């Protein structure tokens, strides 16, 4: 593919501005949680995939953890299945879980892999390994309300993820965990991304979302937070 003078100048400008970051994160693992509006618009999806491929091209090791709330909501509506939320978590019965597994584990996961490959990087859908990677248990709220098949991460077994990284492949992971009974559980993608980043000792965790950032109870944006101030549900 050829580029004209203006395009070449733009590429040179971007690379020049990005050089300090390329040098800083060369060879480092970076976990990216991908969600929100960026997953719904074609131009944004392609832009995301292009940027991930570029990160790999310049020597970084991106690991993708994706959500899929809007797509799940749309599929549930089409199927005539009512959905509700408690404390921000989608109540997930068995009918809902069937759609959640299909949308997250098959459709979105594979679409992301295909888009990244389209920009010249190698990516792999990790869904088949989720049972061994994300070990979880049912999430219980203090209010005692039943969320159904909603989970929390108990531990991350990162062996398969590291294998892909070592082979130069970008792992693409859906937020589906499994408990000791073998039940599939729907888990908040932000929480999964955080646990995976910690397990891999990721250099940085990036959350791509349409929420401005961490907010206090009244909605005011918090620019800095420490461990004592942070609350984990």
Regions found by a protein language model. Name each.
Residues 1-233:
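Nucleotide/pyrophosphate-binding catalytic subdomain
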């Amino acid at each position: 593919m050829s580029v004209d003078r203006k395009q070449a100048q733009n590429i040179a400008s971007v690379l020049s501005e990005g050089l300090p970051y390329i040098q800083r994160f060369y060879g480092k693992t970076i976990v990216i949680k991908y969600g929100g509006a960026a997953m719904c618009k074609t131009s944004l999806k392609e832009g995301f995939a292009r940027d991930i491929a570029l990160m790999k091209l310049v020597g970084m090791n991106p690991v993708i953890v994706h959500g899929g709330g809007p797509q799940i909501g749309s599929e549930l509506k089409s199927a005539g299945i009512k959905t509700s939320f408690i404390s921000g978590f989608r109540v997930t019965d068995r009918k809902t879980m069937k759609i959640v597994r299909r949308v997250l584990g098959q459709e979105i996961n594979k679409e992301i892999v295909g888009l990244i490959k389209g920009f010249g990087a190698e990516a792999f859908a990790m869904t088949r390994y989720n049972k061994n990677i994300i070990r979880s248990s049912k999430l219980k709220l203090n209010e005692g309300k039943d969320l159904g098949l909603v989970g929390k991460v108990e531990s991350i077994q990162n062996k398969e993820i590291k294998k892909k990284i070592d082979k130069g492949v970008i792992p693409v992971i859906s937020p589906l965990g499994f408990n000791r009974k073998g039940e599939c559980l729907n888990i908040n993608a932000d929480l999964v991304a955080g646990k995976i980043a910690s397990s891999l000792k990721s250099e940085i965790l990036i959350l791509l979302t349409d929420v401005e950032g961490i907010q206090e109870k009244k909605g005011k944006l918090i620019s800095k937070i420490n461990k004592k101030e942070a609350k984990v549900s």
